[in-house]
Design a protein with these regions (language model features):
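Short helix-to-coil transition segments within interhelical loops
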Residues: 49, 85, 160-163, 168-189, ...
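A short amphipathic helical element positioned immediately N-terminal to and/or at the very start
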Residues: 3-5, 42-49, 321-330
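Glycine-rich helix-loop "coupling/hinge" segments at transmembrane-helix boundaries
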Residues: 114, 207-232, 318, 478-505, ...
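Short, Lys/Arg-rich, polar N-terminal cytosolic tail immediately upstream
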Residues: 1-11
Length: 539
């Protein structure tokens, strides 16, 4: 009877796997494939014959390497200061480092322009100088500050996982603190450093909000593809440019999976160790403290100046305080309402699909579970601009015409954030024994009852955590929806971009502050809710 019940569970897994595969094909592989094969040969040849596009490709790759490197170094210093040195106010510094993750990605660009632009508070009012923040230097600084928290969180986890006995053993053998760091700590940090560099590099390549605002004449593939669609509606050229953008991001993604998957940096043996870590080298402790405090002050300055800009009469000319920018946000209520509505439904799509995929992968009762795992994580390598353009091409005709509707936005957000929700679902499902489900089935429970009464309640923490984080990402998303919004389906982030392009800095700053406030409220609400069931939210 027990084995009979085991067999009764399998068809449900096959059904779940088939449904998940159909959704992945229709709303992920199909749009991606259409963009790759959309351009006609003459159209592709016309685009590729223009050296300007390859210059933009080179610029994008170079910026990924440059910003990825500086963000990783900054993240390492920040993580070392908080985890190993444990500087004063570490909790506050950690919270400050999360702000760029929670805020819309273009917020730092707006703040940099308010500070260092042609009418900037520092450049014009304080220093009486003309400094052109637009271009590759401004973009490099902005993307470093925007994405260094990704490196910080990755490296902080790696530093916490390194046991003190390894470094203490080297110290007991006579190695200096600097030698211990160079020969023991740094090699153990290598997988984290590579992961950080690749993660930030992918994020920089896929970034759209910062380049479109602050890159100026420094051509980047995302901005050129955007201009080709919005300015000329040249889908041939936009598809080629988006495909050029996809290539390096997928390469970095595959390197990350293969390189980190094949290397073993085992530091935990059968015996646990409570030995403390030896003191950090003096020079590094001082440098890490200076870097971390400087970065934190700069982040606070960035968001402080954004708040100041939201209550200034006319930035660059009249700095007297006013609330008119906030009172004028009444006409943005439909955009804010749509943002909350679509973001919530998109998070539901992400969580449900991620849970289904994690279920069939961890239970391994289907063919090629590794294939499902790969396609559940591959959206992390797809720039949002590329996926959004794919949806425009794929769903602009019968029998599945979705353009101009809210459904296309919800589905795009849901599929784009699938890897985030999948990570939480996999981490929790891997810890749940299959014997619980089999025991319930053996007692007569139907497959649906097994999932609803056993599996799902045990996954509450993962569902809430994945839903909270994907909800946050949806609220502040710009790239994936830029081609999908219409006058009937406006969203707040695209409104901010329109305000920036129109020079309405006060309105743009006030709407950005509202979005940041919504993101913080969602985060704190999610943390409280998850703690209520006895778990913690890990970003």
């Amino acid at each position: 009877m027990f084995h009979a019940r085991m067999e009764s569970v399998k068809p449900s897994r096959i059904l779940i796997g088939a449904a998940a595969a159909a959704i992945l094909f229709l709303f992920l592989l199909w749009p991606v494939g259409l963009i790759l094969f959309y351009p006609t040969l003459p159209g592709a040849a016309r685009v590729l014959a223009n050296e300007h596009w390859f210059e933009a490709l080179w610029h994008s790759i170079a910026m990924a390497v440059l910003a990825g490197g500086t963000a990783t170094v900054l993240g390492l210093a920040y993580a070392y200061a908080l985890v190993r040195i444990r500087v004063r106010w570490s909790g506050l510094l950690h919270a400050i480092a999360l702000l760029p993750i929670l805020a819309p990605p273009f917020v730092i660009s707006i703040s940099y322009i308010l500070l260092f632009g042609r009418n900037g508070l520092i450049t014009k009012q304080l220093l009486q100088m003309r400094l052109d923040i637009y271009g590759w230097k401004g973009l490099w600084l902005v993307q470093t500050l925007t994405f260094f928290p990704l490196a910080y969180l990755t490296l902080a986890n790696v530093l916490r996982s390194i046991p003190g006995n390894l470094e203490q053993a080297a110290s007991n053998l006579g190695a200096s603190n600097s030698r211990v760091f160079r020969d023991v700590t740094l090699p153990l940090l290598r997988p984290g450093l590579v992961a950080s560099l690749l993660l930030v590099g992918i994020s920089v390549l896929a970034d759209f909000g910062n380049p479109v605002i602050i890159a100026g004449d420094f051509s980047m593939l995302p901005t050129l593809a955007y201009l080709k669609v919005t300015g000329w509606f040249d889908l041939d050229a936009a598809s080629v440019l988006a495909s050029l953008l996809l290539a390096p991001t997928v390469v970095l993604f595959l390197i990350q999976r293969v390189w980190l998957g094949r290397r073993s940096y085992v530091t935990v043996s059968g015996k646990t160790s409570q030995q403390p870590h030896p003191p950090a080298p003096v020079w590094m402790a001082r440098a890490a403290c200076v870097v971390s405090y400087t970065a934190a002050v700069l982040i606070v300055l960035v968001y402080g100046i954004l708040a100041y800009g939201s209550v200034s009469q006319a930035w660059g000319y009249d700095y007297s305080l006013t609330l008119r920018h906030f009172t004028q946000l009444g006409r943005r209520i439909p955009s804010l309402a749509n943002t909350m509505h679509y973001s919530l439904l998109g998070a539901v799509v992400s969580v449900l699909l991620a849970t289904a995929l994690a279920y069939v992968v961890t239970r391994k009762k289907i063919l090629v579970p590794g294939t499902f795992d790969f396609f559940a994580t591959v959206p992390a390598a797809i720039p949002g601009l590329f996926l959004g353009l794919g949806y425009v091409v794929a769903f602009n005709q019968d029998p599945l015409r979705l353009t101009g509707t809210s459904f296309i936005i919800i589905l795009a957000l849901g599929l784009w954030n699938l890897p985030t929700a999948y990570r939480y679902a996999m981490a929790n499902l891997a810890q749940l024994s299959e014997q619980l489900e089999l025991a319930a089935a053996n007692l007569g429970a139907k497959p649906v009852r097994v999932v609803s009464s056993i599996t799902m309640p045990l996954l509450r923490g993962a569902l809430l955590a994945g839903g909270t984080v994907t909800f946050l990402r949806n609220v502040t998303c710009l790239s994936v929806i830029i081609f999908l919004v219409t006058p009937r389906t406006p969203m707040a982030t695209t409104d901010v971009l329109a305000l920036v392009e129109g020079g309405e800095w006060g309105q743009a700053a006030s709407l950005s502050i509202v979005l940041l406030g919504i993101a913080l409220a969602l985060l704190f609400g999610g943390i409280r809710l998850i703690r209520h069931i006895g778990q913690e939210l890990e970003l």
